[in-house]
Amino acid sequence: MRPLTEEETRVMFEKIAKYIGENLQLLVDRPDGTYCFRLHNDRVYYVSEMMLKLAANISGDKLVSLGTCFGKFTKTHKFRLHVTALDYLAPYAKYKVWVKPGAEQSFLYGNHVLKSGLGRITENTSQYQGVVVYSMADIPLGFGVAAKSTQDCRKVDPMAIVVFHQADIGEYVRHEETLT
């Protein structure tokens, strides 16, 4: 387990900033302690300094996971967020999409959000902006990328895609053997 390099930190923070913007500072400087990001087996973990000190006694090859997995770096050095980061990103999300109850199940099975399933969308959401997807009961379901801006969503065909699927809480069941 090692700290992220400058390049890895930049790539990861750019990806997270697509979803929470300048609220990224609130993620790092928390009132309940100091938190940091660490890399282990191409996966980035969000861990408290206190837990990091306790884990120093465990050898790297025996360590499976530590803290919360925020995502992983692909072989092409791009950062991909995991659904396990949802609990930390959802409270700080700038752009949100609420899906109707009938479209929740479709999204949780890994499908995109269609206009017919769109309940609400945050004003001034631009195209290709990172959004957090919520149920109408304000339960975070996952994240995606806005396929259309807020203005375009109003006048688009009901079967058009408005949010591209990225990750959802259904992955806990679908990929339980690979999530760490």
Swiss-Prot record:
GO biological process: ribosome assembly
GO molecular function ontology, one term from the record: RNA binding
Keyword Nucleus: yes
Start and end residues of each stretch annotated as N-terminal domain: 1-92
Annotated keywords: Nucleus, Ribosome biogenesis, RNA-binding
Cellular component per GO, a single term: nucleolus
UniProt cross-references to CDD domains, sorted A to Z: Nip7_N_euk (cd21146), PUA_Nip7-like (cd21151)
Gene3D superfamilies: 3.10.450.220, PUA domain
PROSITE patterns: PUA (PS50890)
Annotated stretches, region: C-terminal domain: 93-180
Cell compartments where the protein resides: Nucleus, Nucleolus
Main location: nucleus
Source species, domain of life: Eukaryota
Keyword Transcription among record annotations: no
Quaternary state and interactors: Monomer. Interacts with pre-ribosome complex. May bind to RNA. Interacts with NOL8. Interacts with FTSJ3. Interacts with DDX24.
Record's protein name: 60S ribosome subunit biogenesis protein NIP7 homolog
